[in-house]
Amino acid sequence: MKLRKMLLTLTAAAVLALGTCAAYGGIPAAKGSVTEAMGTGAMLKQAGIKTPVVNIPGCPPQPDWIVGTIALALQKIKEKGLEAGLAEVVSLLDSEGRPLPFYGRNVHENCPYLGKYDEGKFSATFTEKDGCRYDLGCKGPGAYCDSFERKWNGVNWCVANAICIGCTEPSFPDGQSPFYSN
């Protein structure tokens, strides 16, 4: 990170890391990469900077997660002042630094195919719509976000026609690979 940006984080009340790459390193930090990329929180920690980081992962992050997190922070700051308001926002983060209002629910437990999973009925192909796609590589059981409810711009979400690849998780992409398997 350039020195100017690093200095800005010293005086910032908090930093929002938007997208999985900014939050955890994402694809640039994947195995085999020579970039030495890392998430914002890891980079600040390495530099000894204690500014709180709020991670808004996703590839891409859902726009409501970004706007909602900013609105939540502004509301808490207005109600309680800067320090107490930000402390409350930080208390609403999960262990990975994500806001629980958006990342507190498991994708698998809210999947429209959960009943098929429970019945043991799995799809053999991506075009087969009558079964759970877990056997095809769906990462929903280990993924947390509310995309099942919010969708992208209220229109659609990954599992509607494909599988969850776990893009909101710190282990993405290496820990979520291979994306497709049988």
Predicted regions mapped to residue ranges:
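Long, low-complexity C-terminal extensions of enzymes
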Residues: 138-182
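Iron-sulfur-associated redox domains of electron-transfer enzymes in respiratory
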Residues: 1-137, 141, 148, 154, ...
